A protein has these predicted regions:
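Short, conserved acidic/polar surface loops in the N-terminal third of protein domains
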Residues: 1-3, 28, 57
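Short regulatory helix/loop adjacent to the ATP-binding pocket of P-loop NTPases
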Residues: 1-12
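Conserved small helical "lid"/interfacial subdomain of P-loop NTPases
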Residues: 14-40
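Short aromatic/basic micro-patch
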Residues: 19, 49, 157
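Short polybasic/polar patches that bind polyanions
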Residues: 30, 46, 118
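The conserved phosphate-sensing helix
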Residues: 36-41, 46-57, 98
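Accessory nucleic acid-recognition modules appended to NTPase machines
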Residues: 52-206
Length: 206
């Protein structure tokens, strides 16, 4: 939409695609003969978000943990390199976008623009404004007011489940399989954060 070259002003109508809700994911799993209880369904959302393309990659013969291993942890798994591939396909120079997300992944309550700009890899100015706007428009982050930390001050928070999962467990990889992470301190920390994101993305339903 903001392209300055040949495609500028040639958009007839923007379409804002949003991830599936938990209910829609449940319908998709049923269509694909994927058997899960509600707890597993929520955890699958905590990992993959409501992205139907990712959910269609599930193998019905495997458990949720086995699907996570096959798709994300195997060297040639379909989603092993998805985190980097996604952002390099979306943005010409995604390095600062990635730096913003990786910093926000460390702060579940969010950070102000000023706090983000103090990071050497992020910086400030109009570039930060543009990058934050692009990430918000794509649904990776949200901007909100947190009146418990300062009246009227705007905060930015990571709200994309797959991005959080990828940063915590794929980019900063400590183990070779999802099974090794389960019940580790890092797993429980992520689980609390990811569950909050799922709830936040389902406020109308809740």
């Amino acid at each position: 939409l903001t392209n300055k070259k040949g495609f500028h002003n040639r958009i007839t109508r923007p379409i804002h695609l949003v991830p599936f809700s938990l209910a829609e994911c449940e319908e998709l799993f049923e269509l694909n003969d994927i058997v899960m209880n509600r707890s597993q369904m929520i955890e699958s959302y905590m990992v993959f978000g409501g992205i139907p393309h990712y959910l269609n990659l599930f193998d019905s013969r495997l458990s949720l943990a086995q699907n996570v291993n096959e798709l994300c942890f195997k060297e040639y798994g379909f989603l092993h390199d998805e985190y980097n591939n996604l952002f390099y396909s979306l943005y010409d120079k995604p390095e600062k976008h990635l730096a913003i997300l990786e910093r926000l992944a460390k702060s579940r309550d969010g950070l102000t623009r000023a706090e983000l700009s103090r990071e050497k890899e992020i910086g400030g100015g109009s570039v930060l404004t543009k990058d934050l706007r692009e990430l918000e428009e794509c649904g990776f982050i949200r901007k909100f007011s947190n009146f418990t930390r300062g009246e009227g001050e705007q905060f930015y928070q990571l709200i994309d489940p797959f991005t959080l999962f990828s940063i915590r467990f794929i980019k900063n990889k400590k183990f070779d399989s999802w099974n090794e992470y389960i019940n580790s301190p890092g797993y429980h920390s992520w689980r609390g954060n990811a569950f909050e994101i799922v709830c936040m993305n389902h406020i109308p339903q809740i």
